[in-house]
A protein has these predicted regions:
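A short beta-strand element within the Helicase C-terminal
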Residues: 162-164
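Conserved catalytic alpha/beta cores of large enzymes that bind or transform nucleotide phosphates
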Residues: 166-182
Length: 182
């Protein structure tokens, strides 16, 4: 496949096309050997102006046919400027959870399209990191009892002497979307 790679097996030449989130997941699996739900990344090269290229759509359809129908999936953004040193983009892009295998293409198109929203453009304009492009992570969905977000520096003060965590019961999307408070 040209546009899709299994997490933990992303070739070195493609790692600059998968965004911070997918790169972190790939490294956790490949180098740290952590128990991370299996998944795939659709590279930023597959997306142009918020739309999935036709060849990439073919690859996603093939992936849909290979995924287990017993599992559901989380389809998440991994923008090239997301989770970087200068900006987190937390909650800016769309996420779709609990997606059946046959809904992966539609969910991927929705997540990729979220890169072209006013909210994301405004956030990006306020940041110094203007790197453009969005990759999409497709990962087996785990239904959590609790989930959260950990910041490696205080998002209010910017101090990095300690970690700041926010947690909610249920899915983390409730927190990052603003639909639930920690």
């Amino acid at each position: 496949m040209e546009y899709i790679f299994e997490l933990g097996k992303v070739p070195e030449w493609a790692r600059n096309k998968i965004g911070g989130k997918a790169l972190s997941l790939d490294l956790m699996i490949r180098e740290l050997r952590l128990n991370v739900p299996y998944g795939y990344v659709v590279t930023a090269s597959a997306v142009e102006d918020g739309k999935i290229r036709d060849k990439a759509k073919e690859e996603i359809r093939l992936l849909e046919s290979k995924l287990s129908s017993k599992d559901t999936y989380a389809v998440r953004s991994s923008a090239l400027s997301e989770d970087g040193d200068n900006a987190s983009f937390a909650g800016q892009y769309e996420t779709v959870t609990d997606v059946a295998a046959e809904g992966i293409l539609e969910a991927t198109e929705f997540v990729a399209g979220s890169a072209d929203t006013l909210r994301v453009r405004d956030y990006k304009n306020a940041m110094s990191d203007k790197e453009d492009g969005i990759a999409v992570v497709i990962q087996r969905f785990v239904k959590p009892e609790m989930a959260g977000v950990v910041f490696t520096s205080d998002p209010i003060s910017g101090r990095d002497e300690y970690l700041v965590g926010n947690y909610v019961r249920g899915e983390g999307e409730l927190l990052v979307s603003g639909n639930s408070n920690a």
